[in-house]
Amino acid sequence: MSATKKIFFASDFHLGMPNKDVSLEREKKIIDWLNHCTPQAEAIYLVGDIFDFWFEYQRSVPKGFVRFLGTLANITDQGIPIYLFPGNHDLWVSDYLVKECGVTLIREAHEFMVEGKRFYVHHGDGLGPGDFSYKILKKIFSARSARFLFQWIHPNLGIALAHKLSKKSRLAQNPKKDHYLGNQKEHLAQFVTQHLASVSPPGHKPDFYIFGHRHLVLDVQLDTARYLNLGEWLYGSQYAVFDGESLQLLQWPSQQPAKSQNQQSTINR
């Protein structure tokens, strides 16, 4: 990686939530952030739930987001890779964004090495012990048959229904009302601990686990690794940046360190 370049990570934009006007303001804020990243970006990782709902019908996609989609295309046209992970809200992302915006779609956990550091990146949904009801639902909705059946629902009805269900989601609530449950209760923290124990040889253990989904800004030291959660953009606007030496959680637009909600400050390793 070039000494002047950086890798950026963000998640949980939830574009489309809770209404057109509020979403548009958030979209413009995200575009400002992307334009800030572009001149110095080695790569940009968008780690799930970028859209509050997304479905690609045979001849149509959801209205809106044209500024955001155009910005993605402009960035990839410059040769800067954008890696997009589907989340639980936009798990039906398919090849439209690949063909029209040039993004690289990554559906599973992604591991990579940069400057001697190993990264493990995933949206975070369905990882760790428990949450069996969601894991079953994810398998059902991920099936081709589910997509096939949904496409026969008129878009006006299907998209409206999806947004209505989303507004009832616990994660649509203000994260200030939520809190970190501790390393022994948080599914993603448990996943990191279990994954670290399963990796052999030790030199293959990730240094950084980067997730979204939880809607909390987290920087947790677990054994030899750091677990970072990227926060959200519904009420906040946080992101992570790796400069080849250190990985930091920052707040946009101040670019100041984001306060970790597990009461642990950002640590450079």
Predicted segments with their positions:
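Short, basic, low-complexity termini and linkers enriched in Ser/Thr/Gly/Pro
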Residues: 258-269
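Conserved beta-sheet core of the metallophosphoesterase superfamily
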Residues: 102-107, 125, 130-137, 141-144, ...
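Short hydrophobic-aromatic micro-motifs
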Residues: 9, 118-122, 228-229
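Structural motif
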Residues: 114-115, 222
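Active-site metal-binding loops of divalent metal-dependent hydrolases
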Residues: 11-14, 49-50, 88-89, 124-125, ...
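Active-site-proximal loop/helix segment associated with metal-binding centers of metalloenzymes
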Residues: 124-191
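Core catalytic region of metal-dependent phosphoesterases/phosphodiesterases
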Residues: 2-6, 10, 15-114
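Short, well-ordered, mixed-charge alpha-helical segments that flank or form enzyme active sites
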Residues: 91-95, 121-122, 128-131
